[in-house]
């Protein structure tokens, strides 16, 4: 009887974790992927970089639930890169061509500090660098 309790209890914890994972994945799929974004705010050590991104539209395209292509479009020019996330969707790695100077700031590992759309707020992953990136869904 006691062994059955622990066995059932262990299964329910796994089921709860799987359900939480499914909710996170569904939110990311529905609200982050395949949506158009613009830079709402970009600061690097207090310097406002937002104007550098004026006119750009960014789109994270679903490849798998954890990675895929990203596009940055300005006028008719499209730049291609990649994005990836971790299993709990708390991290977003953006890689864009660093031949475009404004993409150097964006191409890094970010952590989500807020996903309250229409604005997703990001800060550097694993560091306290004073960098901020806010992306607004269009």
Predicted regions and their residues:
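Sec-dependent N-terminal signal peptides
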Residues: 1-5
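Lipid interaction determinants
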Residues: 12-79, 88-138
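C-terminal motif of bacterial Sec signal peptides marking the signal peptidase cleavage site
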Residues: 7-10
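Acyl-CoA/ACP chain-elongation machinery
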Residues: 83
